[in-house]
Amino acid sequence: MAIQTEKPIECVGCNTFDMKSLFDNRDCSQVIEYIYDSEGQAQEALAFFTQKARDVESEPCEIQSEITKVDDGYLLKADFTFCCQAELVIFQMRIA
């Protein structure tokens, strides 16, 4: 049975929070390490991740990457450093 009332429900403080408590900008980097079957696949993956970073950035994202031949294939190691933690979180959601 639902409660019926003509008076609107007021909730002071509901759905509000201090953004500084969520994003303190201590963590602005994402390291990605994957092994691909071919160097071409690793390069395509790097291009994909780079484009996702470029789509998110408000200031240039610093990207350091290398592709190395390993026993199982080709290891892509990439470090994406954003200007703020909020951009990092958006990037993480877009690549998930």
From Swiss-Prot:
- GO CC terms of this entry: cytosol
Q: Which InterPro entries match?
A: DUF406 (IPR005272), UPF0234-like_C (IPR035571)
Superkingdom of this protein's organism: Bacteria
Per the similarity annotation, which family is this? Belongs to the UPF0381 family.
Name of the protein in question: UPF0381 protein HI_0636
- Organism of derivation: Haemophilus influenzae (strain ATCC 51907 / DSM 11121 / KW20 / Rd)
